[in-house]
Amino acid sequence: MVLDAVLARGRTVCKHNGLLILSVLSVIVGCLLGFFLRTQRLSPQEISYFQFPGELLMRMLKMLILPLVVSSLMSGLASLDAKTSSRLGILTVAYYLWTTFLAVVVGIIMVSIIHPGGAAQKETTEQSGKPVMSSADALLDLVRNMFPANLVEATFKQYRTKTTPVIKSPRGAAEEAPRRIVIYGVQEDNGSRVQNFALDLTPPPEIVYKSEPGTSDGMNVLGIVIFSATMGIMLGRMGDSGTPLVSFCQCLNESVMKIVAVAGWYFPFGIVFLIAGKILEMDDPKAVGKKLGFYAVTVVCGLVVHGLLILPLLYFLITKKNPIVFIRGVLQALLIALATSSSSATLPITFKCLLENNHIDRRIARFVLPVGATINMDGTALYEAVAAIFIAQVNNYELDFGQIITISITATAASIGAAGIPQAGLVTMVIVLTSVGLPTDDINLIIAVDWALDRFRTMINVLGDALAAGIMAHICRKDFAQDMGTEKLLPCETKPVTLQEIVAAQQNGCVKSVAEASELTLGPTCPHHIPVQVEQDEDPAAASLDHCTIEISELETNV
């Protein structure tokens, strides 16, 4: 009997969490396979062939980013009134800024305690040859990308100021330029001869940097988010005239989520090759660990403190709910973030986990997640603060309190401009370093371990987005309950739900929404705490509770 119960329990767990279990196993298998193949000395060409299944996974996820962001923001904001959408937007952005600043503070405290720069040795390297970008240009590029000049181009390119060195010619003719030649003699060791040397003291040419407009490959997610959010708000104010476009966006969003559900079974297979391929590409682990081990430990410890202590504590204090249960619901999205190191590519999976497992109101998820994937980079902000102070420690540069405050502010601002793409933090790191006068070429010191740390900080970014959706669903539950009667659902968005899912939805901000948005018929097994509305036939005598059904047209629990 006990064995049968255990087997039945195991089958139930595998049935409901099969994809999650496969994802966990794929991460373990990928690590083992990668370290085993390192002993086989594969050529770069063979490694590229080996990474092909993982490359397909990345391409599938990136393919879904654009339609998902546009459709979710436009349909989500169009279904809200102006007051509700403005309150949700203000609370979401304020929460994101606050948690990002907390992440920076945690990073500064950890790097000050561990002091990893004392164990690292700076090697004399040549100039990297990378274009120099000032912090002013980087901040202006952030603002420019918020308002793309060409919306079609924004889907595959973003604005990027290019800085090129220019030799400044002296005024006047070349012969008028000041030039001095010094001739001096040096006697040889035996004293027989004197060698004459000429030293040209012509001053070197002055080099200035010229900024020119340019572009870089990659989707301008920030500009698309701004445009889609504006369109969604305007569609909501247009009333019935904007309904066709809203319906199109809702159906597009639903179809994308169905594609995600089908493609999800390929994810464990692709994760194996993504992780194993990255392990094959990395440098000698022993040499990297000896040089940057304390730095990596500092970043990971900061991410653990912020992601597993501070963010869950905020969720518990605000919602009075168990954060472990919530985090378990988005565990698959965290594993995809670990494999892809891209919060934007993980966006479809995060949607799926929040709607199916945590039963978050889909309108909140449609707004909070795309915005969070663009501006909420807690892990990136923490990493940039740690890296900046680490570089200062390597150079024996003492930072005063004012410079630490400058780092905290610039790291918070720079993380907002970091697109949800792999290793975007290295680009915005220039802003943080130049704000306190640190050499930007020293970014090369941390590149060796950035590929691994990028995956862990992406997990924290995705976790912060998911917890933010849960917190906003709790804070704005009354606003959405009052606004529930104004939303019209498409047939493609109505699905049957169980009583357990109704109770779970009530706990995530839908206390009155089930009754107010739906036409419910009282059934014999319906809990008494769920407000219902009895729908009777024309003949009262023919009405029987045994033939009544429950129809829920509001709650969406399966994608």
From Swiss-Prot:
The GO cellular component terms are: axon terminus; glutamatergic synapse; photoreceptor cell terminal bouton; plasma membrane; postsynaptic membrane; presynaptic membrane
Which example biological process does GO assign this protein?
monoatomic anion transmembrane transport
| Reaction equation(s) it catalyzes | K(+)(in) + L-glutamate(out) + 3 Na(+)(out) + H(+)(out) = K(+)(out) + L-glutamate(in) + 3 Na(+)(in) + H(+)(in); K(+)(in) + L-aspartate(out) + 3 Na(+)(out) + H(+)(out) = K(+)(out) + L-aspartate(in) + 3 Na(+)(in) + H(+)(in); D-aspartate(out) + K(+)(in) + 3 Na(+)(out) + H(+)(out) = D-aspartate(in) + K(+)(out) + 3 Na(+)(in) + H(+)(in)
- Compartment(s): Photoreceptor inner segment membrane; Synaptic cell membrane
Q: Which UniProt keywords apply?
A: Cell membrane, Glycoprotein, Membrane, Symport, Synapse, Transmembrane, Transmembrane helix, Transport
Q: Does the keyword Cell division apply?
A: no
The GO molecular function terms of this record are: extracellularly glutamate-gated chloride channel activity; glutamate:sodium symporter activity; L-glutamate transmembrane transporter activity; monoatomic anion transmembrane transporter activity
- Oligomer and partners: Interacts with the PDZ domains of DLG4.
Question: Tell me, what does this protein do in biology?
Answer: Sodium-dependent, high-affinity amino acid transporter that mediates the uptake of L-glutamate and also L-aspartate and D-aspartate. Functions as a symporter that transports one amino acid molecule together with two or three Na(+) ions and one proton, in parallel with the counter-transport of one K(+) ion. Acts primarily as an inhibitory glutamate-gated chloride channel being a major inhibitory presynaptic receptor at mammalian rod bipolar cell axon terminals. Glutamate binding gates a large Cl(-) conductance that mediates inhibition, affecting visual processing in the retina.
Q: What is this protein called?
A: Excitatory amino acid transporter 5
